[in-house]
A protein has these predicted regions:
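Intrinsic disorder
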Residues: 1-97, 101
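Glycine-rich flexible loops
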Residues: 65-265
C-alpha cells in the first residue's frame, strides 16, 4: 500500500468527507487544494478530527477551520445535567416520536432520498432537537435524535447532529415564533428551485389558502453558514422557502405543521 505525506486534491471543486477518510487511510498528513475549493462541513470535521492540515498550492499551509460539529470533536464538553434532563424529559420524548413519524412520512412520500433531509424542533430557549447526519429518514428512531444549542454545538445524543443544522438555527434566530423546521427535497418543488422559479398562484386552492406565496433563495453550498444565511431576508414573511438548486425548507409551530407545508407545496 502506498503511504504519503500529502494528498493532492487540487482537481476537486468540492472536498467531501470520503476524500478525507481516503487520505487518512493512506497515511496523508496534509491536503493540497486550490483557491476557492469548497470543503463540506463533514469533511471539515474529518480534517479536524484526524489532525490534518490543508494547503493551497499557491499559499502556505494552514489548519482547517474548526467545525461546529461538537459530536465529531473528541474534546467537546460533556452535556450538562440540565441538558440531559431536558433531553430525556417526557416533552422531549414526545417530540422525538413526532420527528421520527415525520421523517418516515417524508421518506414514504419520496420527499427525501438516501440520507437527505433534516428535521428539528426548538424545545427550549437555547436547545434544539434534531435528526442525525448520514441517516435515512426511513431508519429514524427516537434514540438517534440529537440536541444542540443555538450555535450548533451538540449537547446531548449519541449520534452526530445533521450537518445542515445551521439552516434550522438561522430560522429560529430570525423568527422567534418558529418551533418546528423541516428541510426536504420534493421532486416537483425542487425542480422549481433548480429552474429559478416559484410556483404560480391561482392554480390549486389548497396551495393559495394553506401556503400562499413562497420565496426563492440564491444557491450556496449546503451545510455552510452562508447557505443558512440565504433565508434571512425571507423567513419572517414566508413559512415556505425554495432553496436555490437544492430543495425546500418550511417552519411552523410544530414539526407536523411544517411538514404539512411541504406536502401542500
Amino acid at each position: 500500500e502506498t503511504r504519503m505525506s500529502a494528498l493532492d486534491l487540487t482537481a476537486l471543486r468540492v472536498i467531501a468527507a470520503k476524500h478525507i477518510d481516503s487520505a487518512a487511510s493512506r497515511g496523508a498528513k496534509e491536503i493540497l487544494t486550490r483557491q476557492g475549493v469548497v470543503i463540506t462541513p463533514l469533511a471539515a470535521d474529518a480534517i479536524q478530527r484526524r489532525g490534518l492540515t490543508t494547503r493551497q498550492v499557491d499559499g502556505p499551509a494552514a489548519p482547517c477551520p474548526a467545525s461546529k460539529t461538537s459530536q465529531a470533536n473528541p474534546k467537546a464538553p460533556a452535556a450538562s445535567a440540565a441538558a440531559q434532563a431536558l433531553f430525556r424529559s417526557p416533552e422531549a420524548e414526545r417530540i422525538k416520536a413526532e420527528i421520527v413519524t415525520t421523517g418516515k412520512k417524508l421518506w414514504h412520500r419520496q420527499f427525501v432520498d438516501g440520507n437527505g433531509g433534516n428535521i428539528s424542533y426548538r424545545i427550549g430557549p437555547n436547545e434544539v432537537l434534531c435528526t442525525p447526519t448520514l441517516c435515512s429518514k426511513y431508519d429514524l428512531t427516537p434514540e438517534l435524535i440529537c440536541m444542540v444549542d443555538l450555535e450548533g454545538n451538540q449537547i446531548a445524543g449519541s449520534a452526530a447532529r445533521t450537518s445542515e443544522i445551521f439552516l434550522h438555527l438561522q430560522i429560529y434566530k430570525t423568527v422567534p415564533e418558529a418551533k418546528g423546521v423541516v428541510h426536504c427535497h420534493p421532486p416537483h418543488a425542487t425542480a422549481y428551485a433548480i429552474a429559478g422559479r416559484v410556483p404560480p398562484s391561482g392554480i390549486v386552492p389548497e396551495f393559495d389558502v394553506f401556503v400562499g406565496a413562497v420565496a426563492l433563495t440564491p444557491y450556496e453550498t449546503p451545510g455552510t453558514q452562508r447557505f443558512a444565511e440565504t433565508v434571512i431576508p425571507y423567513v419572517k414573511n414566508y413559512n415556505t422557502v425554495l432553496l436555490g438548486n437544492h430543495g425546500i425548507v418550511c417552519w411552523a409551530d410544530t414539526v407536523t405543521h411544517a411538514e404539512w407545508y411541504a406536502e401542500v407545496l
